Amino acid sequence: MLNRKINRVIKTALVCFPVAIISALLLAGNVYAAGEVFPKIPVDGQKEVPVNAQIILQSAVGLIQGPDSCFLNGEYIAPASIAGGMAIFKPGQLQFATTYTMLVRDGAFLSKVDNRPLTGGSYSFTTCSPKAKVFDAVVAKDGSGDYTSIRQAVKAAPNNRTEPWLIFVRNGVYEELVRTSTSQPNICLVGEDKERTVLKFSITSYGGHERNNSLFPEAEGQGPVLVANSSDFYLHNITVINSWGYDNQAGPQALALGSYADRFTMFNAVLKSYQDTWQTGRDEHRHYAFRSYIEGAVDFIYASGNCVFDSCTIALCRNGSVVVAPSHGAGVKYGYVFRDCNVVSSKPGTARTNNYWGRPWHNRPRTSFINTSLSKDINLSPAGWIDHMGGLPVVFAEYNTIDHMGNPVSLASRNTYYWTGSDRNNPTETCIAQAVLSKEEADALTVRTVLSGTDGWKPDNITTELPAPLLYYSENRLYWTAEPQAICYEVLYNGDFLTFTTETSLTFEGDVSGYRVRAVNMYGTLGQVSDPPFVNGIQTETAGALNVVFDGSRLLASGFCGKARVELYAIDGSKAGQYEIEENVRLDLGSVRFVIAKVTANTGTCVLKAVR
C-alpha cells in the first residue's frame, strides 16, 4: 500500500519537476523491487507529451545492455545512453496527437550487479497536438505577401530558431540567388506549385567565377542558385534551375543546389542543371530527398554525407551521363543510397545511351542503387561504373535494377576494379569494390537506418502528407473535418491558393464546387487535396444491390437479406454510433451528430457523406 501511494506521488511529481530531480529521488528511495520494475518517463498513460521528448527507463540497480530489445510502436529502438540505473532513448521527432507504446522485453537490460536479465514491461503515452499557426511569411511577386523575393524572406528569417520557420512562396519565376546563414536553422521553404514556383539564376562556379562580386554580387562567394548553409533546411514544392547549365545544356560547373549542413530535407522539388546540379556537403551531413526530380549530365549529384534518395526521378541530359561523383571519407557508413528511383531521359522519347551510375571523385566513396527502374529511353553501360577519377570506392553497388518492361538488368559485367594515378597500367593505388548487394543488404538500407544518427532524425515524418479533409457546405458556409496533426489548412479555389486558416470553416463566395482544402503539417508540408464539397441534405448511394437513402434525419436501406450494420463517424473521426437495421425499415437518427454513415450488408457496403 505504501509503495502504491509513493508511486502516485512520483507520477504527480514527474509532471511538475525536472527529470533529473525525480530520477535522483527514485534511485535514492529504492521504491521499486530491485532490478525488476522500470519507472517510465513519460509516465504510463501520460497525455500531452512533447513530440521532442526523450524516453527514460530506470531501475534501482545499475543497468547494462541485455540480449533482447525495446520497441516503440513496433519499431526497434536502442538506448542512446545507459548510465547507472538510467537508460535514455532519443526517438527523434514524434508524431503529434499520436499514442505510442513502449515495449521493453524481458532481458533487454541486465543487472549490473550480477548480470541477471531484468523483467521488462510496456506502457503508453500520447503526444500533444500541434500549436495552431499559419505560415510565418508569404512571398508573392505581385506584392500581396510579406515579401516580393525569396531572398528577402530568407534573409529576414530569425536566427537560432528551434521550431520550423515557414515561408510560403506563391507561384512565379524568381530570378535570384538565395542563401541561408549558418545561424538560421529550421527554415522551411514551401512553394505553391512545383511546376509554377520557380527559383532560377545563371551562374557558374568555374574558375572561381562565383567569387567575382562584379559578376555575381549576391553570390556571397558560393556558386549554387540555392544554398542551405543552415541545419534542418526543408525544400518543398519548388523548382530550382541553374540556367547556365540548363539553358546551354553544357558545362562547366553550374550548381542548382548546395546543401552544406546537417538534416537537409527535400520533398516534391525539382533540381535542373547540367554539370554538378547538387552538391551534398560534408561527411557529417545527412540529406533526404523524397519524390523529387533531379536532372543533369555530368557528376550531377556529388560530394559527401549519408544521403537517401527515396522514390526520386533521375533525369539524364545526354549520352554518357554520369549520375554521381561521391567523395566520402573513410568514416562514412552508408554514403549515397538510392531507393525505388526511376531513371529517365530529360527529353522523353530521346534515347540516352552508354550511361554510368557514377565515378569515384575522392576518398572512399559509397553508393547503392536499390530497386531502380530504367525507362525505355535509358541504356546503361554494362560496366555501370567508371573505374577511375580520384578515389577508391568501398561500395559502388546495386540491387534489383529493372528495365522498362520489368525485366532484371544483368549485373554480371559490373565493374569492381578501381585505380588512381595517371597510368592504368601503373596505378598509384587500386581496390576491389562491392558491385552487387544481396537482398538482405538492400533491405537493411532503410531511411531510418541510414539517417537516424544519434539524434533519432526522422525526415520521413517531415514529408508526411496529411490526409484530405472531408469538405461540405451548408448555405454560404464551407466546413471540413479536422486533422489532429495539422497546424493550419490551405484553401484553394479553382486550383489556386486562396488563403491559410487555422479554423475548420469559412464563408465562401462564388461557385462552391471550385473550393478545395488541404491540411498543413508543422513543417509546412502540403497535404492531400480534398474532393469537391458536398451539400448537407438528401444523400443516395448504391453498391451492387444495396441502396441507401438519408434524408437528413432518417436512413433507409434496401436490397439485402437479414440485417445491415450502420456505423456513424463524427467530424474528428471517432465513432458516433452503431446500429443494426432491417430492409426497408427507417432508422431515425434523432440528434446524433456525424459526417459519415457506413452501411454494411451482405450485398455490399455504402458510405454516405451525410452531415449532421
List the predicted regions and their residue ranges.
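C-terminal outer-membrane/trafficking sorting elements
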Residues: 539-612
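Acidic, low-complexity Ser/Thr/Gly/Pro-rich repeat segments typical of extracellular/periplasmic
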Residues: 33-131, 482
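Sequence-level preference for short, compositionally simple segments enriched
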Residues: 128-477, 481-484, 488-490, 498-533
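Extracellular recognition modules
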Residues: 101-105, 516-520, 596-600
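Short beta-strand elements bearing conserved aromatic residues within extracellular beta-rich modules
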Residues: 68-70, 489-491, 566
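Surface-exposed, short loops/turns at beta-strand junctions within beta-sandwich domains
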Residues: 92-99, 507-515, 588-594
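Short beta-strand segments within Ig-like beta-sandwich modules, predominantly Fibronectin type-III
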Residues: 79-83, 496-503, 577-581
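Edge beta-strands of extracellular beta-sandwich domains
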Residues: 122-123, 524-535, 604-612
